[in-house]
Amino acid sequence: MKALVLSSGGVDSTTALGMAAAEYGKENVIALSISYGQKHDKEIRAAEAVAQYYGVEQLFLDLSKIFTYSNCSLLKQSTEEIPQESYAGQLEKISQRDGENPVSTYVPFRNGLFLSSAASIALSKECSVIYYGAHADDAAGCAYPDCSDVFNNAMNEAVWEGSGHQLRIEAPFVKMNKADVVKIGLSLGVPYELTWSCYEGGERPCGKCGTCIDRAAAFAANGVEDPALKYRQEKRLS
């Protein structure tokens, strides 16, 4: 049995990759990293480092043209700045202005496109399961609607039926928060020092964007320092 893992180089997808490698063995795991026109390539480089660490096959796919018409703040062509505040703060402002809507860093239907593309590749590579790292914090308040349990169940059913019952989706964290994801990863020895989450592309994480804030809180909840911050500090000083 083989597994394909959507690997962005961040905490959640790297934990999912660690789980898949532990479950199926590295020789039966493929990492798929997708470019979508984001403002920097730090996460793709992190995904490469993670794949090398686990010794798994890695594939790359460029879907950037699909998102050419979006003004999502994560994308190169966007006229919007990436918000420098927590998701809770962003959602509160959005709610007051527009009601329940996604945050500006929501890439339109990204997970739907990623999973559909991954399904085609997974079937071609004789995989029977796709792993991805969506978790409950991302879906909260409709911040990222394509991370919800409802969305995951619908996509899983579509992939299962559309593949002739050959392929399913595994989203192990969809009912967990990010702190729970980190807890699992720490128990598996996931190389978080190699990961990148920040929406900015600087030498060090900005510490101010929504994903940086969530990441810091998740490690703090587990009583540990973020290994990536320590790792980058040591590299800078060496």
Model-derived features: where do they sit?
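ATP-dependent adenylation/nucleotidyltransferase module used to activate substrates
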Residues: 1-189
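Short functional micro-motifs and their immediate structural scaffolds
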Residues: 25, 190-191, 214-217
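Local cysteine-cluster metal-coordination motifs and their immediate loop/turn environment
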Residues: 112, 116, 196-217
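Iron-sulfur (Fe-S) cluster-binding segments and ferredoxin-like electron-carrier domains
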Residues: 127, 204, 210-234
